[in-house]
Amino acid sequence: MHDAQRIASETVDAFNAHDESRMRELYAEDVVFEAPGDVHLTGRDAAVEYAMSWLRAFPDGGMRVHSEIVAGDWVVHEFTFSGTHDAPLQGPEAEIPATHRRPEGRGVEVLQVRAGKVAADHLYFDQVQVLTQLGLMPEPAAAG
């Protein structure tokens, strides 16, 4: 297995195990992390805290990787995240109280691995889908 692929796989495993210390080992000190909601973070502590905030809010949360592309030091995962929203989630604007709903949605994560550490992590998912499944936005109107 390619080094970048191994590190990316271990990152998913650490996330699914809710293993904060392992995530800290896998991320570079100066990792650049981006996510929907205009989230732009620099540094291991901030990136791991973002992940842990989701895992605290979704205590049974995890991701299933459906496909993976490896190109040099880049790894792309297409995944599905699901979990039960049983604790508050800190959003970019405000805290979202627990809804006790179980959203499930697809996303893409683009990781760059350098010197055996995740140097960049760019996360993409449909915020409207998540908020709708949590009951915080109305269902979109049917096309027609």
Residue ranges and their predicted role:
Residues 1-144:
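C-terminal and inter-domain tail/linker signature
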